[in-house]
Each structure stands twice: as structure tokens, then as C-alpha cells.
Amino acid sequence: METRDVLEQVKTGIISIEEAEKYFKKQPFEELGYAKLDTHRQIRSGFPEVVFCSGKPDQYLVNIFLRLYEENGEVLGTRAQAAQYELVKEALPQVSYDEVSHILKVEKAGKIRQGKIAVCTAGTADIPVAEEAAQTAEYFGSNVERIYDVGVSGLHRLLSKLDGIQEANCVIAVAGMEGALASVIGGLVSRPVIAVPTSVGYGASLNGLSALLTMINSCANGIAVVNIDNGYGAGYIATQINRLGYSYGGENGTDIIFGMQQWN
């Protein structure tokens, strides 16, 4: 719940001044001993705290998930395993789990999604990382178009989807092996491109390092690169860009943000 929501509820009598005081006293974080829940993050950044599930002891994960759900009415976890899902589900039956992206979440019903992000992959093997990006962006309120298996070994596949890609406020390009997809897309669109190298590939791909270096050294303009397999990071920053688009230029934001003729 945001500060304004608390004040509105005090104004309308939904909660008392004493209850509001308790809420503000636990700002800006809640101490659990093993974790400090950042209850002010949405106020500062516009997005609530997200749980990185991998490596967390079982009971810690369950407690963190419950507290963030109680705080925000929804919660997102990344890099979760099926066994962790079963544990969280015992305490929070409405939680859902996606076996492809390894995302664990409880999401508010009736959420309005705006703008558009295009998520593209070079190959089918890149889809788990792409889905982490796509589902993160959807959770944070963006419309997402998935355009999968359009890598450079069959460039005609990408060109057949170019209209949809060019309509997006931001493009996420997910690729392993040599990682060329991001450069190709960067040369075809006027939108920002978030490049995500994946660990997909044979020996000399070095678990994604080859793709990472290709993307960092791209000749195409307008490309930013996140870490290897970091779909969550790509989905997050793409949503920030997408919000700028629909905030300033209508549904997709293209008239003001990306239509250069508007600046003449």
C-alpha cells in the first residue's frame, strides 16, 4: 500500500489514525532478522520488492512471500523451483508457478496493462529467459507481444514480424550462441533495445559470455545489455521505458517519445 492510499483511507474513515501511525512506523523497511523487507520500494521506484527465490532457506522464503503479499496484495518471485512452489502454496494457496520461467507469483485480479513491449528470442531454447522477462513486464503492468524463434539463421522469420516489433515502445532481444539478434533488431527499429545474452550454446559460447561480448560490442545504436540470463532485469527496465511511452504519448507513446517529427 502506498502512502497516498493510507492517507486516503484515513480521510474516508476506513482506517484510524492509530492504524496509519503503525503503518508509517514500520517504514522504510520491516526487520525480520534474516531479511529486511523494503516496504518503501514502491514509493521510491514505482515497483514493489521482488523475491529472488534461489538459495533461500525454505522457511525464510515462505515468510518473506507471506509478508510481501500482506503488504502489497501481490508478490512476485523469480528463479523458483517446483519444491519451493509446493512449500509456499501450503501457506498461500492462491500462488501460481510457471515451470518455464520459474516465476512464482500472486497477482492482483483485473490488472490494467498498458503500452507494448516486444520480447523476441533467437531460438526456442532462449524462451525460459524470455518468459522471465515477459512475465515480469506483465506483472508490472505492460502489454507484451511474444515473438519467438526469429534468430539470424532464418532472418526472413524476423522480417515477417517486423511491423509488430516496430510498434512496441521497447524491444527485448534474447539470444544465446553468438548473440547477433540484438544487433539485427537494433538496426531495424527506432525503439530502445534491451539485449539479454543467454547461456545457450556450445563450448566456445562460454555459458553466455560470447553472446554478452557480442551485444556489448554491437555496432547498432540504441542497445543496452543486461547480465547473462537476466530476464527479470530486462523486463523491469523495459517496463520503465514503456511507462514513459504511454505516459507521454497515448497508448503506445509513439507520437511524442519516438516520433521525431513531433519535435520539429
Put a short name on every predicted segment.
Residues 61, 126-131, 155-156, 175-184, ...:
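Short glycine/serine/threonine-rich phosphate/pyrophosphate-binding segments
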Residues 103-105, 143-164, 209-210, 226:
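Glycine-rich oxoanion-binding loops at beta->alpha junctions
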Residues 121, 163-166, 200, 204-264:
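C-terminal binding/interaction regions
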Residues 160-198:
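Glycine-rich phosphate-binding loop
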